[in-house]
Amino acid sequence: MKNIISLISKLKRKDKNFNKYLRRNSTLSESEIVQLSYDFQSGEYIKRYNPELVRKNLTPVIDEINKTTNIKTLLDFGSGELTSFSYVLEKLFKSDIKFYACDISFNRLFLGSLLLEKKKLLNSSINLFCNDFDKLPFFDNSIDVIITNHSIEPNKSNAEKIILELYRVARKKLILQEPNYDIACESGKKRMMSNNYVVNLSQILKKNGFQFEIIKTKYNFNDLNPSSLYVIKKNTRVKKNCKFICTESMKNLSHVKNFYFSKETGIVYPILNNITIFNKKFFFFKKSI
């Protein structure tokens, strides 16, 4: 792993595409490649943060959230540096909602937490956690609404696993804002294939018998990567308590100061800078400070 980190540091200085290079020149799994790529890019989204562009991009998501009644819990999956999540908070902050945001990259969440502090958006209703790509520390049917914003996009091989996990945890609705290969131009389709993006979301949803609709969006950050909202309705009447659980035993955790632990497995989940760590392979790079 030291060799990989050294190599990516050199690639960064040469402004190379980490994800593409590692897919071609390493034996790392897709989830490891995605995590390392985002870890080393941490801070780039905050540097380019433009509130007006974020507003345009997320307005359809907010509109869809507001169509859902009696929301008590919301998860932003693959929240990165929390730039989009901060807008969601600003629009819904006065509501009685308990918010969760997660990402595979601790470094991105760490920088995002500083952004939320700067915006005075951090409080006890917000829970940040670093997760494994396809494991969420929640009971079935425990989160009312789950949203994504291009976070399934780079996980082509694992897209179905991720969607099934999101569906397991969701109670009312999934709102996935993800690339729509079917409406992309030829150049866009080639770009999606070259970048190893998910191109078959509709087929995955149909295969699993989900009730869903596709809503085209008017604005895209990149016209070569057009997105749509994939709105999956669940509306189960069963509701479990929304609290962190052990991702191995799927049972309750005990909370002691700055960590959670499982009595069944003995696994400890530390809390760093108000971010609970469920990802066993997380890294922290000094450059994030």
Q: Which residues does each PLM region occupy?
A:
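Short alpha-helix
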Residues: M192-F212
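Short conserved loop adjoining the S-adenosyl-L-methionine
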Residues: K135-D140
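A conserved beta-strand element that flanks and buttresses the S-adenosyl-L-methionine
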Residues: I147
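Conserved class I S-adenosyl-L-methionine
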Residues: M1-N66, I289
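A short, conserved alpha-helix within the catalytic core of class I
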Residues: P154-E165
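Class I SAM-dependent methyltransferase SAM/SAH-binding core
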Residues: L75, E81-F133
